[in-house]
Amino acid sequence: MTGFRVAPGGVQELYNVNPDLTTLGKIIGGGLPVGAYGGKKEIMNLLAPEGPVYQAGTLSGNPLAMSAGLTVLNMLEKDVYIKLEEISKTIEKGWNQNIIETKTKAHIARVGSMMTLFFSDKNEINNYEDALELDTDRYAKYFKHMLDMGVYLPPSQYECLFLS
């Protein structure tokens, strides 16, 4: 979910990470069912025909998905990410303002255009134990209220709201 949502080079670019392997999902096929992977030369050389690991797929290189993916990737210019960041900051600011005004015990987690609202006494949710303490009933009520107002949020605070 982080392939191209936050930067042209994904979270790898954002956090300056150079992984051994990278996987990409639907975006690489313009939303069509396809995936891709890549990695360091010494790992990728293990794949056939150079290496002993055979890899194949029914839809590998599907022309429709590749064409759609190329079209989307060509559209993802830097200004798209700047605009998404501006909109995301506006939503985060509004949520925070509402949290303060209503004295709600909640926390917003956001990276680029991905965000979620946690109902919790904690200022940050960092691990599984923190997540176990989330007020899921409160989120369910909030979700229903927002839906009634025409705002579509993820049905669980364990899911992420995507603007991208």
Language-model segment annotations:
Residues 1-164:
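Conserved N-terminal phosphate-binding loop of PLP-dependent enzymes in the Aspartate aminotransferase
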